[in-house]
Amino acid sequence: ANTALDMDKIIVGRYKIGTSARQVNPRALGTQNNNWSNQTSASRGGFNAEIAELSNLRGDVKTRTIFKPTNGSSVPDLKLHWDADRLMFSMVDTDRRWQVFEVKLDGTGLKKLIETPEKDLEFFDATYLPSGKLIAVSNIGYNGVPCVNGNDEVGNMCLYDPKDGSLRRLTFDQDANWAPTVMNNGRIMYTRWEYTDLTHYFSRFVMHMNPDGTEQKSLYGSGSYFPNSTFD
């Protein structure tokens, strides 16, 4: 009866977790461990994960593997390209650092999307822009979350141009940003941990901005009591 299944196929991140399916938490699925951290705090190996295509959703569901890491990485942050012929995702590289990769839906053409000479930079939670550029969350500030003594790195957003390799930081927040998403009007919606005008200790508000990082404004949740946190 679920009308969301009235389609030919869907693309999913698939994790084979055996008999512990009813007990898993975010750590077991390769994502951040709590509501203030980001992908740099997630486990970097030991997963049996893949990107898969599911079809025949109303009958005997068929599964086709699109991509499976050989290094035990998880495959979070799936984002389909506008042309629907490829997708981006996050995965650890050979140096065990998070990077943004792209693969075609037929499983070919795997490549890293963001190239930078700064080897300590990590990128994840990215999105395609209509201009051909990318926005990704990164540890570019090299700072930690203050209320946990810096034990979790802060992720702020960057703008990357694949044509010339230019990288520009867009946000300079004390705490993390998550889930940049292109809105119908071309602006970027995202969530941000907020310490200003908060009514709760744990506050994640929905923000929006222009793709170049200008006009960062609250979209939903600023000053409200409930819900006190939003997620992607």
Language-model segments: residues:
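Beta-strand-rich domains and repeat architectures in extracellular enzymes and scaffolds
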Residues: 1-58, 70-80
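Beta-rich catalytic cores
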Residues: 6, 47, 74-76, 83, ...
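Short, conserved, GDST-rich strand-edge loop motifs in beta-rich repeat architectures
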Residues: 15-46, 92-93, 97, 136-153, ...
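A short loop-to-beta-strand structural motif that recurs across blades of beta-propeller domains
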Residues: 43, 50-52, 99-101, 156-158, ...
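Multi-bladed beta-propeller domains
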Residues: 58-73, 104-122, 160-175, 210-229
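Asp-box/WD-like beta-propeller blade repeats and closely related beta-sheet repeat scaffolds
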Residues: 96-178
